[in-house]
Amino acid sequence: MRTDFVVRGVWEPDRDCLFDTRIIHAGSPGRAAQHISYQNALNTSAREKVKLYKAAAEERRATFCPLIVTVEGIAHQSLQAFLRRIAARLSAKWHKPLSTVTNWVRVRLQFALIKAVDLRTRGSRKRWRSSGFEDGEGIATLFQR
């Protein structure tokens, strides 16, 4: 089992919580043709993740939480609960109002989502250095003995 990240003590003290993320395009033409609502698309994705990971998480005596969000930024209820928990803990730690910290957490999530979607659609910002041969013909000479 390979999840995206593990955090200890999110829901219960000294108990790991396994998180797996998914960004879906709920407004895709395929879903629109089938008249699938955003909430149904989010719930279906969450059920798929739970079905895949829950047994393995329980075997490790951990909890599992799917973090599902659409490309438009609509979050599944499990992600909303996780963000509320993070905001509450940070609010207590930083001695700031909960509303201020909640807005900060949401903005950070939105920027992370924009970055993830942008990298997914456009690719990496790093330029790939080619071998210097425009047509690729010289690459064969590099690998000859």
Predicted regions mapped to residue ranges:
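Non-catalytic C-terminal interaction segments of nucleic acid-processing enzymes
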Residues: M1-T3, G9-C17, I23-R145
